[in-house]
């Protein structure tokens, strides 16, 4: 397997399609050079070729493709997320303002801190948040300088690095030095697509989440794939792939995979398969703790926490942190977005307590005039704080916020059980949820994706994917994404959690 894992077909648990942009050199992409007429034509042709293959998302094989993110998303209705850097807004939201993220690049002599911050601001971060991402080049290691990468004649040049212990040690030593220089470092983001083969080594050695081109690709695929844990098995063409992933992940779950902590509001109900609080919604272990006094009504209103609520929330988070194997904390109510800032201040672990955090990924993935549906249990309850929630997710510009449309499910037959704290009949409710979304999409023909804000809506995600044929993001796609950054990669890596690499 080549070290440039992003282009290796064995790096994924799903099918990939490649299209080459003729005449677009690595040096041009690295420098963010303005595309010539012929290069722009070649780029359009490559995008068209991928669309013709029916791909569900488009990414790139070079982190510097971020320079052309805006151009490509105008060329297609398919979500385009060309660089691992598009994960940055999610990371910025998960961690405290004082905490930093290390960004590894091939060569920081031609992609320095200023260039990184400029790109991050362009994709939606504030200057203050962009400065939290600290660039670290590897040009001092043989093979990583821009000139050496540009001179690679074929991927066989890189085939040896996977077995090079010397190279691994040099990379780990560089990260260790960066950690000493930045004690507030909490995660690693690999801008370089040459590096995912070393992600497991970084996770094992540093003990922090590592986000790369593969975590991004897996996340994008999940938004358009039947969920093998609780999905509908509607689309047989993707189900076999999803089940293959499930079999691999079941093997992982029996081993030493990390756990996710779930911060629960003070609200008792019987969760359905697919709900955040339902243990079988995941292929890994979860731990739950209740913030006593932080009720559903309080979360909806989003008022500042009382002293008692703050104490209860912090206590629950502390217990989750202390639980064995927990590597991150989510929440069981989308309205907890109102308290995302509070949660991340209380914890040294990444906090991602609302599905709303994914809104920026949607805004960045599609053309500026394309729109999204946000399904919620009650539209009137979400509306008052909706703009503030979007801003917390780094969707700050009024024109971008206007692309998100609330769709309340309060009148769907049978869904009132959610408000009553009763068991939901998923089979009964599904047709109503689908009909509601289809009608809304028909009224808004520019709708390109759906976000399920409510943590009791993921059971309907597969039915929506099938009916609308567009990506659906929910609390489960978010939790799986963050978990993957701390998990032994089942397709390649160093097997540091003793997981099975046997594909069933």
From Swiss-Prot:
Its EC number is 4.4.1.3. It catalyses: S,S-dimethyl-beta-propiothetin = acrylate + dimethyl sulfide + H(+). Gene3D superfamilies: 3.40.50.1860. GO terms for molecular function: dimethylpropiothetin dethiomethylase activity; racemase and epimerase activity, acting on amino acids and derivatives. InterPro entries: Asp/Glu_race. Disulfide bonds: none annotated. Keywords: Lyase. Homotetramer. Belongs to the aspartate/glutamate racemases family. ALMA1 subfamily. Mediates cleavage of dimethylsulfoniopropionate (DMSP) into dimethyl sulfide (DMS) and acrylate. DMS is the principal form by which sulfur is transported from oceans to the atmosphere and is a key component of the ocean sulfur cycle. This is Dimethylsulfoniopropionate lyase 5. It comes from Emiliania huxleyi (strain CCMP1516). The gene is ALMA5.
């Amino acid at each position: 397997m080549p070290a440039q894992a992003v282009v290796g077909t064995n790096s994924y648990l799903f099918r990939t399609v490649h299209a080459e942009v003729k005449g677009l050199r690595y040096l041009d992409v690295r420098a963010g050079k303005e595309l010539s007429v012929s290069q722009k034509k070649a780029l359009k042709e490559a995008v068209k070729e991928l669309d013709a293959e029916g791909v569900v998302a488009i990414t790139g094989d070079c982190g510097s493709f971020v320079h052309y993110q805006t151009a490509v998303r105008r060329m297609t209705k398919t979500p385009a997320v060309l660089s691992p850097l598009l994960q940055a807004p999610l990371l910025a939201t998960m961690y405290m303002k004082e905490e930093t993220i290390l960004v590894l690049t091939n060569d920081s002599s031609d992609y320095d801190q200023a260039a990184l911050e400029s790109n991050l601001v362009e994709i939606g971060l504030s200057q203050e948040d962009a400065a939290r991402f600290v660039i670290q080049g590897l040009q001092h290691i043989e093979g990583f300088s821009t000139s050496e990468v540009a001179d690679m004649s074929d991927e066989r040049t890189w085939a040896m690095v996977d077995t090079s212990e010397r190279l691994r040690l040099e990379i780990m030593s560089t990260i260790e030095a960066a950690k000493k220089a930045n004690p507030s470092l909490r995660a690693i983001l690999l801008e370089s697509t040459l590096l995912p083969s070393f992600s497991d080594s970084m996770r094992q050695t540093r003990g922090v989440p590592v986000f790369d081109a593969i975590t991004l690709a897996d996340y994008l695929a999940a938004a358009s794939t039947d969920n093998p844990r609780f999905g509908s098995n509607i689309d047989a063409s993707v189900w076999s792939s999803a089940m293959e992933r499930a079999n691999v992940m079941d093997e992982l779950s029996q081993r030493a995979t990390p756990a996710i902590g779930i911060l629960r509001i003070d609200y008792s109900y019987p969760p359905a398969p697919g709900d955040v609080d339902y243990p079988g919604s995941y292929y890994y272990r979860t731990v739950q703790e209740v913030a006593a006094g932080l009720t559903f009504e309080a979360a909806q209103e989003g008022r500042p926490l009382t002293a008692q609520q703050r104490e209860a929330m912090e206590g629950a988070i502390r217990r989750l942190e202390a639980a064995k194997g927990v590597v991150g904390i989510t929440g069981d109510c989308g309205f907890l977005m109102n308290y995302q800032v509070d949660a991340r201040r209380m914890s040294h672990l990444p906090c991602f307590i609302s599905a709303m955090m994914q809104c920026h990924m949607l805004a960045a993935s599609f053309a500026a005039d394309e729109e999204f549906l946000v399904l919620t249990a009650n539209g009137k309850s979400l509306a008052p704080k909706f703009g503030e929630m979007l801003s917390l997710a780094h969707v700050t510009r009024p024109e971008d916020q206007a692309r998100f449309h609330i769709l309340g499910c309060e009148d769907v037959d049978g869904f009132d059980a959610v408000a009553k704290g009763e068991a939901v009949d998923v089979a009964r409710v599904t047709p109503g949820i689908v009909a509601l979304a289809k009608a809304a999409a028909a009224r808004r023909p520019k709708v390109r994706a759906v976000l399920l804000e409510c943590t009791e809506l993921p059971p309907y995600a597969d039915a929506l994917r099938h009916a609308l044929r567009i990506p659906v993001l929910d609390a489960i796609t978010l939790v799986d994404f963050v978990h993957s950054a701390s998990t032994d990669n089942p397709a390649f890596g160093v097997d540091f959690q003793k997981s099975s690499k046997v594909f069933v």
